[in-house]
Amino acid sequence: MFNRMTSLWMGDLDPYMDENFIKQAFSTMGETAFGVKIITHRVTGGSAGYCFVEMADEASVDRCVQRLNGKLVPGSNPPRKFKLNYATYGKRPEPGPEFSVFVGDLTSEVDDYQLHQFFLKKFPSCKGAKVVTDPYGNSRGYGFVKFSDENEQKKALEEFQNASGLGGKPIRISIAVNKGNKASTYHNQNNTYNTNYQQQYYRQPYNSYYPQWGYDQYSGYNYGYNPYAAPPPMMGPPPPMGMPPMPPDMQGSTEAHDGTEEVEEDPSEDPNPQVDVEELNRQYMERSEELYDSLMECHWLPMDTITSDISMMNGS
């Protein structure tokens, strides 16, 4: 009998992924799976595409969710990424205000777990962290950290700027900026923020910043079935028991399993992009030269006065 408090939900399984394969995958990643229960389809008897994995304790569950999510499953062909969640709804993070920061200049070895632990040691309200990855699971060099306490978010902006100890080089940090609100003003240096910006920012759903975090990555699953009952054909497997229903516009969608998984581009961006001044100057000069050449090649002659007759020109 599985203990849900010490178990993981794992999705996006291919038919060949049996208990031994999953145990070996966790072992390769440095974790020990004590048991695997693959959920089967009630009619066909085949895999329903998800399973439950029992770990040693709750700390191991937390670590796996943070450290392995989004990484490639060892030995998977076609390549698959770990899609993990808590096996019990009670482990879902509590609702409430969330305040995020952008963290840049992350070296390739930094993962979600390391990023979270780096901030958690100093700021107890740190609720989680996400390193943004490409479709192959490689780090893009930046991520996001969220807090439940706004004061600790502001302290992190001050105290962790150019901080060392996470990866191979100092990190840079700023308030998280969503592309939809890029025009909103803020002043990071003296921690004064535009009031309208804050009101808009704190109401934004966090799936804009963390498309692979928490339960949103499984939002397409149908919630009307018991987790141990097989879903109907063309439906994805359900999430852990007790998950509340999603809005109508998010129900009925399914995830791709064609081997070339389409990954939605993260809508967040680096708030301090590097500007190539030489390239911008070169483009400006090219546009200026094109305008000059167009004027020089024009065959119209200037008029003496506004009432002058326009002379006819014979083409050469």
UniProtKB/Swiss-Prot annotation:
Q: Where is the signal peptide?
A: none
Asked if the keyword Cytoplasm belongs to this entry, the reply reads yes
Gene3D superfamilies under this entry? 3.30.70.330
The alphabetized list of GO BP terms reads:
mRNA splice site recognition; translation
Q: Which InterPro entries match?
A: Nucleotide-bd_a/b_plait_sf, RBD_domain_sf, RRM_dom, SECp43_RRM2, TSAP1, TSAP1_C
What PROSITE patterns does the record tag this protein with? RRM
Composition bias type Pro residues, residue spans? 239-248
Positions of the RRM domain: 6-89, 99-178
What is the predominant subcellular site recorded for this chain? nucleus
> Which SUPFAM superfamilies does the entry link to?
RNA-binding domain, RBD
Q: Name the segments for region: Disordered.
A: 239-285
Sorted alphabetically, the keyword list is: Cytoplasm, Nucleus, Protein biosynthesis, Repeat, RNA-binding
Fetch the Pfam families from UniProt: RRM_1, Trnau1ap
Instruction: Report the GO terms under cellular component.
Output: cytosol; nucleus
Molecular-function annotations in GO: mRNA binding
SMART domains recorded = RRM (SM00360)
Task: Name its cellular compartments.
Answer: Nucleus; Cytoplasm
Going by the entry's taxonomy, the superkingdom of the source organism is recorded as: Eukaryota
| Parts of the chain that traverse the membrane | none
PANTHER family the UniProt entry points to: SIMILAR TO HUMAN CHROMOSOME 6 OPEN READING FRAME 52, TRNA SELENOCYSTEINE 1-ASSOCIATED PROTEIN 1-RELATED
Q: Could you tell me what this protein does?
A: Involved in the early steps of selenocysteine biosynthesis and tRNA(Sec) charging to the later steps resulting in the cotranslational incorporation of selenocysteine into selenoproteins.
Give the similarity note. Answer: Belongs to the RRM TRSPAP family.
What name appears for this protein in its UniProt entry? tRNA selenocysteine 1-associated protein 1-like
Which organism does this sequence originate in? Danio rerio (Zebrafish)
Traced from the root, the source organism's taxonomic lineage reads: Eukaryota, Metazoa, Chordata, Craniata, Vertebrata
